[in-house]
Amino acid sequence: MYYLQRLRDLREDMDLEQKDIAKLLGTTQPQYSRYETGERELPIRHLVTLADFYKVSTDYILGRTNNKNYKP
């Protein structure tokens, strides 16, 4: 799943740790780790929150485009 790598790359590009993103999403670090590794499916509400936070489109995170354009 390509989006798993995108989640990790976006987080690491901002020098953030999993615990930082977990806090943003209102979840725990172990739970967020499961999203990044594909053990658990990322809820749509979290996908939208992450797209807004990283200022990219949900399509970019999902690997449907390489265009990061963000439209609030």
Show where each model-derived region lies.
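Short, charged recognition helix plus adjacent turn
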Residues: D13, L62-P72
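Conserved hydrophobic/aromatic packing and binding residues within compact polymer-binding modules
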Residues: L7, I21-A22, Y32-Y35, I61
